[in-house]
Amino acid sequence: MENKKEQQELKNKEFLEKLKNKNVSNVIFKPDGLGALEFDLMMTGKDFKTIERPFRIERVSTDTFFKLSSEKDELAIGKKLLNTFIAQPAEARDIEFFNMDQEALLTMVNVITEFQQTPFLFIKNFGENKGN
């Protein structure tokens, strides 16, 4: 059981390291619903100022995620990912929000995808709580 806990903590640490390298900071996991991540993303806005902007993304059901990722058009996938996962700020659900910073858009899509695929990384003792 100790080894499993250590592996989970290592995965968590690796995930957080990946995020740091993508200009993401202050990551907080929220157990609401299927899980949510709150974080700050360094990005350039329409005002040409580069600041840390707060975001909240929420995990969706596996069925919903697979329907989104089955699209063939990458732009359509990106738009649907933003609209489906971003809870706050609401204006970030529109791809136009990222017009001045394509790197921030790619980072957001990567964070969404990574979080969706690794839902329990942030829940300490998840296996113990489920009786495993």
Q: What is the predicted role of each segment?
A:
Residues 48-132:
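Short, surface-exposed, charged amphipathic helix/loop patches that serve as local interaction elements
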Residues 1-63:
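Short, charged/polar N-terminal "headpieces" of proteins
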